């Protein structure tokens, strides 16, 4: 199936679920997601980002930025194309750039280099949910740089204003078993927000970080990745004793030696494409011992190898 057909096929996949799946808690559906979701456009004109070790920021140069851009980009598709493809979970890190966005609060996305202002991405997400009123998105903002409490409050205010009335209320307002596709569609809720900072506990529309787990293998070895993944899946109930969303990260993490050794190449060509292909094969094996523990699955370069369709179809197994 080509990308255009996949986008058309999966664009409203939650709307098109049969009722028995719409009545299952979201924590027990198979949901495709993207790793470093908004790294498709990294800006080589801005300095090296704050999430990179200081030693590299000291040797900032056009050559260094080009190398980081090739290895920091984990997605090719922009947010709208990912949404049309069927992605419903987004993994996000943000930074405040003093001098760049102090007045407009254009908080930037980043992964090695700075990307777009997050306001642009949020506007695209808002447009999508208005045009697709039965789709539900999970936004997981999990890394913050150069933030203080005042900036957190301003940013949360921006989110609350933009998505007003669309947030799925967080526990204890609802129990996990109440949060289904059907429930969200009946009430017009379309966004489940994780904002992994303690201050977020003051806001009723933000889900606490205790309701999501995203274990990271932190390996550049594909055999170690699958060993870790299968082990950690069977530990889901211990990791989330009160239940919650579980993210399976089917990704490899390059070391600096990997990057130096292949500096003219990219994450996609050296590691990510092969890993996403293996992830799809692993999912298609449909291991009956592991499938009950799967929930959200994320990869790099989500357009490859029918990843989204493969995950969505697991709901019907």
Place the predicted regions along the sequence by residue:
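Intrinsically disordered, low-complexity coil segments
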Residues: 99-105, 151, 172-186, 202-203, ...
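Aromatic-lined glycan-binding groove of carbohydrate-active enzymes
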Residues: 186-270
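A Trp-anchored, charged/polar loop motif used as the substrate-binding/catalytic surface
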Residues: 72-77, 118-124, 165-185, 218-238, ...
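Long, acidic (Asp/Glu-rich), low-complexity accessory segments flanking structured domains
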Residues: 1-85, 89, 98-131, 136, ...
């Amino acid at each position: 199936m080509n990308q255009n057909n996949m986008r058309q096929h999966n664009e409203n996949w939650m709307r098109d679920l049969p009722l028995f799946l719409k009545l299952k808690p979201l924590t027990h559906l198979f949901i495709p997601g993207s790793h470093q979701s908004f790294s498709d456009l990294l800006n080589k004109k801005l300095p090296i980002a704050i999430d990179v070790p200081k030693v590299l920021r000291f040797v900032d140069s056009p050559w260094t930025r080009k190398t980081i851009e090739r290895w920091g980009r984990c997605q090719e598709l922009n947010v709208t194309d990912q949404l049309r493809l069927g992605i419903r979970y987004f993994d996000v890190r943000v930074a405040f750039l003093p001098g760049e966005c102090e007045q407009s609060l254009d908080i930037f996305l980043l992964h090695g280099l700075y990307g777009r202002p997050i306001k642009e991405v949020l506007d695209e997400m808002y447009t999508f949910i208005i045009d697709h009123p039965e789709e539900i998105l999970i936004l997981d903002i999990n890394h913050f740089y150069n933030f203080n409490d005042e900036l957190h409050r301003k940013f949360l205010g921006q989110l609350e204003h933009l998505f007003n009335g669309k947030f799925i209320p967080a526990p204890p307002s609802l129990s996990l078993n109440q949060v289904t596709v059907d429930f969200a569609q009946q009430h017009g809720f379309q966004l489940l927000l994780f904002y992994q900072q303690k201050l977020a506990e003051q806001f009723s529309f933000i889900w606490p970080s205790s309701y999501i787990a995203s274990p990271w293998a932190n390996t550049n070895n594909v055999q170690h990745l699958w060993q870790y993944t299968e082990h950690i899946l069977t530990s889901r109930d211990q990791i989330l004793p009160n239940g919650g969303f579980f993210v399976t990260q089917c990704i490899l993490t390059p070391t600096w030696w990997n990057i130096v050794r292949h500096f003219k190449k990219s994450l996609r060509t050296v590691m990510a494409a092969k890993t996403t292909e293996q992830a799809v094969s692993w999912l298609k094996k449909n291991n009956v011992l592991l499938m009950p523990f799967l929930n959200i699955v994320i990869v790099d370069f989500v357009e490859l190898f029918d990843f989204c369709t493969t995950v969505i179809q697991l709901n019907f197994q």
